[in-house]
Amino acid sequence: MTVTSDFTQKLYENFAENTKLRAVENAVTKNGLLSSLEVRGSHAANLPEFSLDLTKDPVTNQKQSGRCWMFAALNTFRHKFINEFKTEDFEFSQAYTFFWDKYEKSNWFMEQIIGDVAMDDRRLKFLLQTPQQDGGQWDMMVAIFDKYGIVPKAVYPESQASSSSRELNQYLNKLLRQDAEILRYTIEQDGDVQAVKEELLQEVFNFLAVTLGLPPQNFEFAFRNKDNEYKKFVGTPKEFYNEYVGIDLNNYVSVINAPTADKPYNKSYTVEFLGNVVGGKEVKHLNVEMDRFKKLAIAQMQAGETVWFGCDVGQESNRSAGLLTMDSYDFKSSLDIEFTQSKAGRLDYGESLMTHAMVLAGVDLDADGNSTKWKVENSWGKDAGQKGYFVASDEWMDEYTYQIVVRKDLLSEEELAAYEAKPQVLLPWDPMGALA
């Protein structure tokens, strides 16, 4: 239908007759939408106390960057380091992994560009839209750890560009789109593509070294623990990982909950074009039902390990209060609006996808062992939430959490076989390919 002036006039009249909406209009225009609709009772119902609580370590801060997936992964290692080596506080360098991820993503992008994707193919347009970005997924982080190791933050500290990455991304993507044209032209002219690509990668490396700083190949690091014991390390980043973390990351798998019709449960999935290290670990997910998803996360925490997880953090989120709940805001009583889409509907119609990775650091269980709320360690600094920690209600977890990483030995034989089977390849723009 065409929107006529008579129809619009009727809407005006309907609104004017609704005294409740006029009152809400005054509140919202003065105070903002969410501040006006906030439900105070949700605070009392989600107090930050948990029957299983794995850490109270100070939180980290990704600042103005999209490195949450790195922070979450390194935070899981960090808790292990602090506990085993009895340190007051400690951080691994998030800037170090950031450097190598940018470098590898640039090479990954170039490899896709010199493939056989036609210029008018939507997949090529997808690649060129964002040649690289800050975000990533767990398996991409594993690929970086496997190849480059890790270093302490004191050895490779933050730079302006790692803490605020907008300019870096703007000009690195500008460079990579130019490189894409150069590589395509070289192919058309039957030139030496690999030789040209190596020259272009040198430019990328130089750009990253200038903006982020040259990462160490060997280093020394010393510290004293709470017992005043002195420890010193001399070696490479990979040797440091092996000595001070020592986790075999091949023993961990990505588990998702994607209840859409195109993704049957108990099957594995990967996403076309998604990755960073050519020849590195493939991004791969096992899709399970939500009840099983939560039981796996609980089992890992009961074994003493925190859990890396990915979610849509902007949904029903009260950042200042540190709450992720379905009743944080009341649209129905105030605006006569209800949001009734299912999790599958939100995925299918573009309303939701994974936007952020954090750490599950605790859970509150009822008498039957079922979860009621979850302790979430964020990476937005101590001023967000409750000293950097958030509380997620169990219902919010059901609706807006999409991915966890758990030990393989927690899977059943059937689940492990499904994970290890050849994965179904999803389209590049599938929501399960979203980067945290």
Curated annotation (Swiss-Prot):
Top EC class for this record: hydrolase
InterPro entries: Papain-like_cys_pep_sf, Pept_cys_AS, Pept_his_AS, Peptidase_C1B
GO CC, alphabetical: cytoplasm
PANTHER family cross-referenced by the UniProt entry: BLEOMYCIN HYDROLASE
Primary gene name: pepC
Subunit description: Homohexamer.
One MF term in the entry's GO annotations: cysteine-type aminopeptidase activity
Residues of the active site: C68, H356, N378
Domain of life: Bacteria
GO biological process: homocysteine catabolic process; proteolysis; response to toxic substance
Name of the protein: Aminopeptidase C
Keywords: Aminopeptidase, Hydrolase, Protease, Thiol protease
EC assignment: 3.4.22.40
Catalytic activity: Inactivates bleomycin B2 (a cytotoxic glycometallopeptide) by hydrolysis of a carboxyamide bond of beta-aminoalanine, but also shows general aminopeptidase activity. The specificity varies somewhat with source, but amino acid arylamides of Met, Leu and Ala are preferred
Annotated family: Belongs to the peptidase C1 family.
A Pfam family matched in the record: Peptidase_C1_2
Protein function: Hydrolyzes naphthylamide-substituted amino acids as well as di- and tripeptides in which the half-cystine residue is involved in a disulfide loop, notably in oxytocin and vasopressin. Also has a bleomycin hydrolase activity.
Annotated organism of origin: Lactococcus lactis subsp. cremoris (Streptococcus cremoris)
